[in-house]
Amino acid sequence: MLETKINLGKVTYPLYMGRNLLDNLDVLIEDHIEGKTVFLLTEDNVFKYYGNPLLEKLKSSRFKYHIIESGETSKSIDTYGEIIHELTENKQDRDTIILALGGGVIGDLGGFVASTYMRGVDLIHIPTTLLAQIDSSIGGKTGINFGAIKNLLGTFYHPRAVYMDLSTLDTLPKREYIAAFGEIIKYGLIGDYDLLLDLDQHHRAYLDRTRSVDDLILKCIRMKENIVLKDERDSGMRQVLNLGHTFAHGLESSTNFQKFLHGEAVALGLIFASNLSLKLKFIAEEYHQFVNQLIYKYFSDRYILQLDTEGIVEAMTMDKKNKEHRITFILPVDKEKVEIFKNIPIEIVEESLEEIKYGFRCK
């Protein structure tokens, strides 16, 4: 088991990474849960694999649990209300500690619950998907959707610890596993060209799961840690982590969170960002084609057959990065270089949306 620290300046917490951590979770978290009431928040697709063994291990603790339906639609104010209701019905006080066991939805929702219930209770992240392990379990962002608006309600709230059991990836469906590469490619575009070359050279092995992703996870975590350390509250530099997300959130919202997994939407958002950058002559054609072809290798089956341009643009206007009613875009401009743009004409944005409407722009 690897034990390391996530150092975000004002906040530091331990990260434990290895295989079969859930087999000994009761021992590993013993110091964190002493004197606490444990509230396990998980999802049905995860509970069916790991729920009963965990219940058995934690039964000696003061212990409650809640299972939500898997999927982005559960990241709602209704689900949030159900969890708060259960916490109050259980008469759980500020000595509660929430264990968020699951993917990105559980991490975002569990973090939001922990940060708001009684003005804050302790939180432990136990991410079980590749996307949650490389990205959403680190950095302190929490959130739920409101209507069709992605992450409209949220807080910044850090866990006491993160436990990454890499063996949970063995039960992860192939589609969810591959979806995480949208975020991994994003990190390569932001600051690690060698990572992109590795993803390109070994794409078949990654897709077949015959090549370890352990190093990828650590690289993404360290890159995010370094960025968040400089801008925890997302007011400047941290915005580069939203590369591909302006479009992605618009796509997810306009399809009612039903058609695309988040990582898939991010991958398509990277295509959009690269295409928009090319139209504005910010990025070289050769690098643009490399980016698109790399994404195509991982997401060739995730075409956009019908694109609600108006709906996506409307959703993008609600993006949290926007200021003065202008849509903010993070665009790739060169290897390991992305920039923030705030004054792109909406007509150019709509043209780029139309150009990617029927798939990937690759030679």
Curated annotation (Swiss-Prot):
Q: Where in the cell is it found?
A: Cytoplasm
The record's Gene Ontology biological-process terms are: amino acid biosynthetic process; aromatic amino acid family biosynthetic process; chorismate biosynthetic process
Q: Keyword NAD on this protein?
A: yes
- Gene Ontology CC annotations of this record: cytoplasm
Reported EC number(s) for this entry are: 4.2.3.4
- The record's principal subcellular location, in a coarse class, is cytoplasm
Catalytic activity reads: 7-phospho-2-dehydro-3-deoxy-D-arabino-heptonate = 3-dehydroquinate + phosphate
Keywords attached to this Swiss-Prot or TrEMBL record, sorted alphabetically, are: Amino-acid biosynthesis, Aromatic amino acid biosynthesis, Cobalt, Cytoplasm, Lyase, Metal-binding, NAD, Nucleotide-binding, Zinc
The positions annotated for binding Zn(2+) are: E183, H245, H262
Pathway listed for it? Metabolic intermediate biosynthesis; chorismate biosynthesis; chorismate from D-erythrose 4-phosphate and phosphoenolpyruvate: step 2/7
Functionally, this protein is described as follows:
Catalyzes the conversion of 3-deoxy-D-arabino-heptulosonate 7-phosphate (DAHP) to dehydroquinate (DHQ).
Family membership, please give it: Belongs to the sugar phosphate cyclases superfamily. Dehydroquinate synthase family.
Q: Which PANTHER family does this chain map to?
A: 3-DEHYDROQUINATE SYNTHASE
Q: What is this protein called?
A: 3-dehydroquinate synthase
Q: What organism does the record attribute this protein to? A: Alkaliphilus oremlandii (strain OhILAs) (Clostridium oremlandii (strain OhILAs))
